[in-house]
């Protein structure tokens, strides 16, 4: 039967390998939604902290798919796990038990020390699930009247572009002309404990959700002790403390989770991106029974969430972080990278900031950060600007000392040469 099916399948169009970069750009422009503005580079291969374009040029990857490939591109352990599980069982839905989900649930809850995990797929799904859990807890446990729960977010947050996510956004690029928005959301300035306290005094507040380090805002770090202050305030006013660790977590900041820098234990933690090492969309919500067990069968779910392939990949991705000491490497290599970046002339780069391998530079506004990224690309390093004047540097956590030094040399030379020519 398969052979007869193959005979009727039409031949595929010309493969991407034989296309030039420009042909790839043109095809995407013609057939795809124009919801991204990528750097003009067409990638076809990745390994460790490097990627190659279709013409064979090699680049340092200093974006790491927005921290989804912390373990490095095409990690051999992840590749093996995917191949083995994909040949056995990939998806059952949650209509049935499978033999892998429980293994993953036990592993991830013991690793992060929470009672329960809710398995999802993407970061935005997991964040939205956290909001749902917080609302239900507010009604069932805190005693908020139905449909009156409020969730507070930090300004300049980013957790996706679903209707709920943009309802919490303060970035017009995300929310403008997409209303009406989800009610019951409020925002307060980031890194401002008084603003948090003023907002969560309201008896209807269910939760405060915050990124320990704001990624899309430009790797913005709060003052030391901010998260501890938030945690204390949430306890004082009986409000759930949620950390969005989708981008900042899993070693990126030099700690397994970024909120570990402040020695806090949030009520809910959201994970994603590097939870699969770039092989598969996997996300998770972690919390204790007093929050998680308010959700009953049929009240929340996901066809793909907790599937066998995702679970095996997530276990392997977390094992790699520990076995290869990538969290520790992030801390050491991050210090090295930051020390190099801080040698950039202050009249060109006004600010260098970061933790671990989660770094950013702020370019003088008279220079165009997008054009700097184009020059970096020409010189063999890929990075992406955000908010016009900020360039993020976040390579895979497997990068070594020699590679950091080579990459830093590219950055320093590119930025200084660009300033001289402009």
From Swiss-Prot:
UniProt modified residues of type N6-(pyridoxal phosphate)lysine: 273
Pathway(s) of this molecule: Amino-acid biosynthesis; L-proline biosynthesis; L-glutamate 5-semialdehyde from L-ornithine: step 1/1
Taxonomy, superkingdom: Eukaryota
Main location: mitochondrion
Family matches, as InterPro entries: Aminotrans_3, Aminotrans_3_PPA_site, Class-III_PLP-dep_AT, Orn_aminotrans, PyrdxlP-dep_Trfase, PyrdxlP-dep_Trfase_major, PyrdxlP-dep_Trfase_small
SUPFAM superfamilies: PLP-dependent transferases
Xref: Gene3D superfamilies: Aspartate Aminotransferase, domain 1 (3.90.1150.10), Type I PLP-dependent aspartate aminotransferase-like (Major domain) (3.40.640.10)
EC number assigned by the record: 2.6.1.13
The keyword Protease appears for this protein: no
Keyword Signal: no
GO molecular function: identical protein binding; ornithine aminotransferase activity; pyridoxal phosphate binding
Annotated catalysed reactions: a 2-oxocarboxylate + L-ornithine = L-glutamate 5-semialdehyde + an L-alpha-amino acid
One BP annotation, GO: arginine catabolic process to glutamate
Record's subcellular location: Mitochondrion matrix
Cofactors that this protein relies on: pyridoxal 5'-phosphate
Coiled coil (residue ranges): none
Keywords per UniProt: Aminotransferase, Mitochondrion, Pyridoxal phosphate, Transferase, Transit peptide
One GO CC annotation: mitochondrial matrix
Family the entry assigns: Belongs to the class-III pyridoxal-phosphate-dependent aminotransferase family.
Name of protein: Probable ornithine aminotransferase, mitochondrial
Organism: Caenorhabditis elegans
Lineage: Eukaryota, Metazoa, Ecdysozoa, Nematoda, Chromadorea
Name of the coding gene: oatr-1
